[in-house]
Structure formats: C-alpha cells, structure tokens
UniProtKB/Swiss-Prot annotation:
InterPro entries: Elf1, T_Elf1_sf. Residues 84-110 have a biased composition (Acidic residues). Pfam families: Zn_ribbon_Elf1 (PF05129). Residues 84-120 are annotated as: Disordered. This is Transcription elongation factor 1 homolog. The keyword Repeat does not apply. One of its GO terms (cellular component) is nucleus. It comes from the Eukaryota. Zn(2+) binds at residues 25, 28, 49, 52. It comes from Arabidopsis thaliana (Mouse-ear cress).
Amino acid sequence: MGKRKSRAKPAPTKRMDKLDTIFSCPFCNHGSSVECIIDMKHLIGKAACRICEESFSTTITALTEAIDIYSEWIDECERVNTAEDDVVQEEEEEVEEEEEEEEEEDDEDDHVSVKRKYNF
C-alpha cells in the first residue's frame, strides 16, 4: 500500500505595509507637516501644511489614497514651476532678440554715415 499524496502548505500571505499619510511640505520643506484628508462623502481629497498653511484639494475616487493626493500636489507644483520658467525664458529670448535687432540697426546706421563721408 502506498502513502496518500500530501498537500502542500499554502504560501504565507505577505502583509501590506500601510502607506504614509503625513508628508513634507513642498513650500516650507518642513518634514511631516502635510496631512492628507480624504472626504469620501464629497469625493474631495485635501492636503494641507500645518506650518505654512498651504493647501491643495482635488477630486478623488474610491481607490484614491493619501499618497495619491500628495503626488498630485507635487506634480501640480512642478507643472506650474515649469510653466513659469518657460514664460521667463521666452521673455528673456524676446529681450535678447530686441537687443540684437537694435545692434544691427546701429551697425546699419554706422555704415550709412561712412558712406556719406565718401559721397562728398
């Protein structure tokens, strides 16, 4: 008589670590000062700094976690900063182009005056 086939033990389930709900502020860089609040009743997520009182709110879904709200805030800050940098860079380029045009006009004026000297 043979042995019965033994069953393998089920693999142990891994515990999921809880995600952070308190983060550092992107404005004042104070560690653990931003707290994320999720209002499922109104589907609004809010991240607010207790130190500098900056805040950000966004619409949420049933799957949204605190880290998602904070990540959206950081992404929005980066998007605004790059947009401002682009505007400043465009303004600087326009000023440089205007200066170059003025220099070219000055150079043309110099050439005209030299020609007038020889025309007499």
